[in-house]
Amino acid sequence: MVDVNKFESMRIGIASPQKIRYWSFGEVKKPETINYRTQKPEREGLFDERIFGPQKDWECACGKLKGVFYKNQVCELCGVQVTTAKSRRERMGHIELAAPISHIWYFKGIPSRMGLALDMSPRALEEVIYFASYVVIDPKETDLEKKQLLTEREYREQLLKNGFGSFVAKMGAEAIQDLLNDVDIDKEVAELKEELKTVTGQRRVKIIRRLDVLSAFRKSGNALSWMVLNVLPVIPPDLRPMVQLDGGRFATSDLNDLYRRVINRNNRLKRLMELNAPNIIVQNEKRMLQEAVDTLIDNGRRGRPITGAGNRPLKSLSHMLKGKQGRFRQNLLGKRVDYSGRSVIAVGPTLKMYQCGVPREMAIELFKPFVMAQLVKKELAANIRAAKRKVERQDSDVWDVLETVVKEHPVLLNRAPTLHRLGIQAFEPVLIDGKAIRLHPLACEAYNADFDGDQMAIHLPLSEEAQAEARLLMLAAEHILNPKDGKPVVTPSQDMVLGNYYLTMEEKGREGEGMIFATPEEVEIAMRNGYVHLHTRIGIATKSLNKPWTENQQDKILVTTVGKVIFNSIIPEGMPYLNEPTDVNLTTSTDDRFFMDAGQNIKEVLAGIDTVRPFKKGYLGNIIAEVFKRYRTTATSEYLDRLKDLGYYQSTLAGLTVGIADIPVVEDKHEIIDAAHKRVEQITKQFRRGLITDDERYNAVTGVWRDAKESLEKRLIEEQDLTNPIVMMMDSGARGNISNFSQLAGMRGLMAAPNGKIMELPIISNFREGLSVLEMFFSTHGARKGMTDTALKTADSGYLTRRLVDVAQDVIIREDDCGTDRGLVIADIATGKEMVEPLFERLVGRYTRKSVLHPETGEMIIGDDTLISEDIARKIIEAGVKEVTIRSVFTCKTPHGVCKHCYGINLATGDAVEVGEAVGTIAAQSIGEPGTQLTMRTFHTGGVASSSDITQGLPRVQEIFEARNPKGEAIITEVTGTVESIVEDGATRTREITVKGKTDTRSYTVGMADVLMVEEGEFIHRGAPLIQGSIEPKHLLQVRDALSVETYLLGEVQKTYRSQGVEIGDKHIEVMVRQMLRKVRIMDNGSIDVLPGTLMDISDFEALNETALLNGEMPATGRPVLMGITKASLETNSFLSAASFQETTRVLTDAAIRGKEDHLLGLKENVIIGKIIPAGTGMFRYRNIEPLADLTNAPEVKEVETETVEN
């Protein structure tokens, strides 16, 4: 066997008849499979042991030669070679076809490769191949033309006219094979290239397509005639198995039926030809054979598919590769693995961040070989077999050994669907009783897990290297930050938030208010003995608290609460004392207003300070981010565990409960409702009088009810009591939001009808009062629509992620610095007055391309090619800089990847990105994972606000990445210049905008309802939109350059995600958008050997041009092409990756003709062939490490004799 990790590349081609015979171990002559009495394979049949190898290891068919001793010997009696039964998965057979047969992939594919090679239409080909017409192969002296089609009648007439043998015309694939053999590729290519110089239009397109196919055959060394089969390969029998079911019946793979049809028809044809049967019978048999082979290769490609029992189409060879259940996606890209298990998850509140609970029963099975080895080593079992029996009996000493084996051996936990890389993390197992896996509560957010019956899979890394990687790179305690935005992904939720919120609350006048303590210990004693409450405001000596005070805060008394003293006791030393939820308090120091001198009256001080709001969920997230920034992972995960324990403990003590009486009643609700009813009546009257249109009436009515609901909500917020448990849950961010609260206490408001339109009748009741039957019925529409939308959205979002991963999977950090001199100018992204993404967020963690100077003083804030930290970014913003030129993925010159400087920091670690990081896959996951949070709907405004429906949410993201023509397209100007005039035309309800440039003037017609983006006299650059809407990126690319398009797409994706409250780092979108513009279409090939119209990678194009210029030749010219992600995935250089994505047969047909070579640069192609992926620690530069010193001639080291001392 070839060592899979050694070979460099993989090539695919068309098999010649000689090659097929060389692969084969014998000819299959009979359609028989297995003898039903003896259960042995029939001779010369589809399962023959002589051809395909023995059914039992090291044993021939008759049983004469048994055992490894006879390895590779051939039995004289039965003729079977003694070898392993596994050879039945490798040895092929063949069928000698009685007539040539066309291969359906090359004849039927689009475009038909056979048709292009012969310059015949696919219809003509079909008529010839399926025996409907003759084709003239050699007209000799007659007035016929070569490749002319003749019907049966015309053929006979020509024979009568010209005499027998005066010309050669044939039918069937045989005729096509003769024609293909006649083609002189070099001559044809030369003629076509000459013709190409003069022709234009459709003819030019056709010539280029023919040239493409012919030169592909010439370069790859495939012969044209190989597209017609004379020999048919038979795949190994274990790949098309036949198994006996209970009750003596057999289940067989469809391929066996298909092969049987081919063999039957082939044998019948041979017999007919031997008998010299009439021509018409032989022709019919040949046609049937052609159809049988077509069905075997690709059932259903031509005509109706052949069906088996129950009208199910049979699965042909092509179907074995295609789709989700095909060979590529089912068996090569995703395999089932050993050393794994799955179980329901339960919460493990006592675990540390890096631990998970594994049930003993599960662990004993997972770690079985390790336990067995240890039992033998400790001499608790004589040999491995005895150890195995011991483990299966579950003897008492097995459990002790298990404890030692499990220690420090990390396991991987995975929850499906794995939407991003945090869906698989490593934990140290802790053995537990029960049958559920215990999961740390803070790991839930990364997995999107809850404990309502979710299941998780557990996997065991086996090798030392795998264990080391799991521990160092995948341990859950290391994954504090989310790769998509660099914010903490482990934020406390629910009970933890509630506990800490309750702990940091303040109340005036609680017992013991104004007491002053010397140390935190005294505070705790006082609280335990009931002198003070958690919420009591007290004083404490600053010097007893180990915190960084400012000079004038030392030796003073800090005014705080009992709970905050406890809360601050778990925060790492060196952090300020947190007394109020503000950023200043978190990053610099506690506010001076909370300090008093030793002699002051504390009651007076307390009277002058308002109560401070408690710490909510968002603030806890900020604290974690700050702790991480200062102390990195280890300290942060320790702090998180303390925070979790404190939160659970305090919420248990607080014992917050919810009863129906906790839902407040708004006193004047009926007044608000009555006012709304009256307003609706007025609007209806106006409509009846014809003062307003139906659309306006509808919008006004829904607006009234929206206002009514909002005023109720406002009343609720104004009157809310912060000690009310429901309000506490909502306010702290533990559970629920204002919308849930107003449905409980205010009114449910307007509902959506099944078609998505808002119904005019609102639900006036709330859940506390209870809904009427009619209201209940109304509200079910919206609820059902919500459920279906979610289900559809999940599928859509998953498919988007799959396409994104496919297009970017080979983008890896390949080098430290590409040395580019280009950069990207960035500023705030904003729509009108609304800020989408501020400059600050875009700067952090990127490298500068030009120095940034202070706009007023001119001093340098940061130099060229330097990493921008948070502090420097803040300085840049404070200096009032509006634009910065940074290194960007868009302008990176690294082929097949990105360099460290153009990418910036790795958001998941906060440090510089490592060479080998698979940034493409991370980018795809970061964009795909929040896809489910985006909305599905295209917003239909009531026909008033704007004329076009603007696509938003998930459909908009797909529209951008697939480079489709957007809905609600904006017209853009093609010239740079001044807006000369905007003229309205009342008759056609349009406006004409004239833009005058330096050289030419253009006019654009827009509708009256379109919202203008320009004014008369305004100076605009080409590519600027004239009206509101989405720009079509392909049009923008024609008008401007690739970088403008990339910048526009980046902004559009950010707008879509940020409008839904999802933050994604720019660099992820940059990686994806760059992949859409990787290709160049050759316009003029210069002196380079490529055809005009060819698509090429930018890096290859530049390299070829460089070579041409150095040799003093004409370089080629090309223009950048914007491709949607699906198209870009299929145009990748790797045929394995493309074939496993979509359109498998088309990709493979094309690759075979071109004799394509896959250099295995990306991740997918390496997974498919089972090679270690070239990313991370599998990167070439980490795998092939050269030793620094040559130690071959080093002096010998003498062995030192040692003795063991037994104690």
Swiss-Prot record:
Its cofactor is Mg(2+); Zn(2+). It catalyses: RNA(n) + a ribonucleoside 5'-triphosphate = RNA(n+1) + diphosphate. The keyword Transcription applies. Mg(2+) binds at residues 450, 452, 454. Binds 1 Mg(2+) ion per subunit. Binds 2 Zn(2+) ions per subunit. Zn(2+) 1 binds at residues 60, 62, 75, 78. Keywords: DNA-directed RNA polymerase, Magnesium, Metal-binding, Nucleotidyltransferase, Transcription, Transferase, Zinc. Pfam families: RNA_pol_Rpb1_1, RNA_pol_Rpb1_2, RNA_pol_Rpb1_3, RNA_pol_Rpb1_4, RNA_pol_Rpb1_5. DNA-dependent RNA polymerase catalyzes the transcription of DNA into RNA using the four ribonucleoside triphosphates as substrates. This is DNA-directed RNA polymerase subunit beta'. It comes from Lactococcus lactis subsp. cremoris (strain SK11). The gene is rpoC.
